[in-house]
């Protein structure tokens, strides 16, 4: 939370980096490039957060209600939704507090505001880290279900899934607390960036391997049924499109934020980097957008979950 006098706050530390001058003007006393700042209105940011909040709350409620969805796979999906929900809550809470402080409707001592900012930062950082962890866990779960189908239920048991979930939440809280405490150190920023790259590589390798295996399986079935080549190619293109959407959404929504952190560590004073720093709020908005898209990719494609969700909505009326 960007609170003055809170240098150890995540958002305060990130936003306290040297920035360029406003929209489309060269920075003062510099010959660097013109800076384009994409402004995200507070109202739009709040709306995105509220949409994500409602959407992920429905996913968590549907999985909790239906016992048929209490499997390891849906436990990971539920935890991903919970992580995205916390991203939304922390983002909405931070924006609301800043608006109230700016309007003078919320009077608080500097120490109280600083403490609140640190709490929100830990919540936001831990929810981001856990969200990345659970995206990787879902990819591994799907990989095991395809390549070790006969042993899947003995490998991925509910007890092991629960232990993995507990370990992920504990690691997320610990790492985010350490990051907030040492966010002014370059090593802390780079560790977070390396973690993101590791999750990106893990997901890419697993999903690409799954796609190639599925294509080979489809070709084998096509040969048995003597189908034509265009049918095989059409299936392969569909799978490739799905993979491109999955990894593309992940990279486009998370990549700019971690590029921001990388540039803070590498070139905090460079004019071009300073231009990028001005769009930090846009990068946060993209992460909130990812929290909106995740249920569409990982949850709402399940007929069982959608059926339970309809029952919940009808019952509420």
UniProtKB/Swiss-Prot annotation:
Looking at the UniProt entry, the stretches that span the membrane are 38-63, 73-93, 119-140, 164-183, 192-211, 241-266, 280-300
Q: Which residue ranges are recorded for the region named Disordered?
A: 1-26
An example Gene Ontology biological process: adenylate cyclase-activating G protein-coupled receptor signaling pathway
The cross-references to Gene3D superfamilies, in alphabetical order and at most eight, read: Rhodopsin 7-helix transmembrane proteins
How is it placed in the membrane, per its record? Multi-pass membrane protein
Among SUPFAM superfamilies, the record links this protein to: Family A G protein-coupled receptor-like (SSF81321)
The family classification in the record reads: Belongs to the G-protein coupled receptor 1 family.
The record's listing under PANTHER family reads: G-PROTEIN COUPLED RECEPTOR
Name of the protein this chain belongs to: Melanocyte-stimulating hormone receptor
């Amino acid at each position: 939370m960007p609170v003055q006098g809170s240098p150890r706050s995540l958002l305060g530390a990130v936003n306290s980096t040297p920035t360029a001058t406003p929209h489309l003007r060269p920075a003062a006393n510099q010959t660097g490039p013109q800076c384009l700042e994409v402004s995200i209105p507070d109202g739009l940011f709040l709306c995105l957060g509220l949409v994500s909040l409602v959407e992920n709350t429905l996913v968590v409620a549907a999985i909790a209600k239906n016992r048929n969805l209490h499997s390891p796979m849906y436990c990971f999906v539920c935890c991903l939704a919970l992580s995205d929900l916390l991203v939304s809550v922390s983002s909405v809470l931070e924006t609301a507090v800043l608006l109230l402080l700016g309007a003078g409707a919320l009077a608080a001592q500097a120490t109280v505001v600083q403490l609140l900012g640190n709490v929100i930062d830990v919540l936001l950082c831990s929810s981001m880290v856990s969200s990345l962890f659970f995206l990787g866990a879902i990819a591994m779960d799907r990989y095991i279900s395809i390549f070790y189908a006969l042993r899947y239920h003995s490998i991925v048991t509910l007890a092991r899934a629960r232990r993995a979930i507990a370990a992920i939440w504990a690691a997320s809280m610990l790492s985010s607390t350490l990051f907030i405490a040492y966010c002014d150190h370059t090593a802390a920023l780079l560790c977070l960036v390396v973690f993101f790259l590791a999750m990106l590589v893990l997901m890419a390798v697993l999903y690409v391997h799954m796609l190639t295996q599925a294509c080979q399986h489809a070709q084998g079935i096509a040969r048995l049924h003597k189908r034509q080549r265009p049918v095989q190619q059409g299936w392969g293109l569909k799978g490739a499109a799905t993979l491109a959407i999955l990894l593309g959404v992940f990279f486009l929504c998370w990549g700019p934020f971690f590029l921001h952190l990388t540039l803070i560590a590498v070139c905090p004073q460079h004019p071009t980097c300073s231009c990028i720093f001005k769009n930090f709020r846009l990068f946060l908005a993209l992460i909130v957008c990812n929290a909106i898209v995740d249920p569409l990719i990982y949850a709402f494609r399940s007929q069982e979950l959608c059926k339970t969700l309809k029952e919940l909505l009808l019952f509420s009326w």
